[in-house]
A protein has these predicted regions:
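Hydrophobic alpha-helical segments involved in membrane association or supramolecular assembly
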Residues: 24-32, 56-57, 79, 99-100, ...
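Intrinsically disordered, low-complexity regions enriched in Pro/Ser/Thr/Gly and acidic residues
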Residues: 87-215
Length: 215
């Protein structure tokens, strides 16, 4: 009788331990999922606030000469960096703490020559988001695109580029803000979730660059 009871107790104990193990794995998985959702939500808030802060002072930002002007330090000193964004004093760029992605806010000048030999120069403000290949590339891209869409009335365009390890070169596309929106181009205000999914699928496991442009 004792052997039977002891044997049964052992089996029951192993069963309990197995249940605890399953519950522990489930709890860890649930916690990881909740943490990822939290980080993505915080990332979305930080990106949106950065865009709003930059657009609110864009007409006051200094830019002169032919070189690129960076505003990272200015935003840092003016206390205009949202929670979750830090200024890297060694490199000079901005870094978001959630997924360690790099950001530069700058005024860029690019000279061009058209087919007729006419020359000119485009002056454009850019918030440049760079994120290396990762498992969350799609979600990070989606946050940035949605933030750009919310500010479509005040931006020139959103440029997206992905660098594939399997395909040569880059894939680049432009989605335009309200200023340049027309029937012949893709417009931010018209993007739906399917459009964003198609666009950001290029960032799944690939290095991606998104540039939010203003004039």
């Amino acid at each position: 009788m004792m052997i039977s009871e002891n044997g049964r107790s052992m089996v029951e104990m192993l069963g309990v331990l197995a249940i605890i193990g399953v519950l522990s794995v489930g709890a860890i998985a649930g916690y990881s999922k909740a943490m990822m959702k939290y980080k993505l939500n915080q990332h979305a808030v930080a990106v949106n606030m950065l865009i709003n802060n930059v657009l609110s002072i864009k007409d006051k930002l200094p830019h002169s000469g032919d070189d690129t002007t960076y505003y990272n330090y200015l935003l840092y000193k003016a206390n205009l960096l949202p929670d979750g964004l830090n200024y890297n004093k060694k490199i000079g760029n901005l870094e978001e703490i959630y997924f360690k992605n790099k950001i530069n806010v700058m005024w860029s000048r690019s000279k061009w020559t058209d087919a007729n030999g006419n020359q000119g120069q485009d002056n454009t403000g850019i918030i440049h988001f760079y994120f290396p290949a990762s498992d969350v590339g799609y979600e990070v891209c989606r946050n940035i695109v949605l933030a750009a869409k919310e500010n479509a009335a005040n931006i020139d365009s959103l440029a997206t580029s992905s660098y594939s390890t399997n395909k040569p070169g880059t894939q680049t596309s432009f989605i335009y803000g309200d200023i340049k929106c027309s029937q012949s181009v893709s417009c931010l205000k018209n993007l739906n979730l399917d459009n964003i999914m198609t666009l950001c699928n290029n960032c799944k496991g690939e290095t991606c660059v998104l540039g939010m442009l203003w004039k």
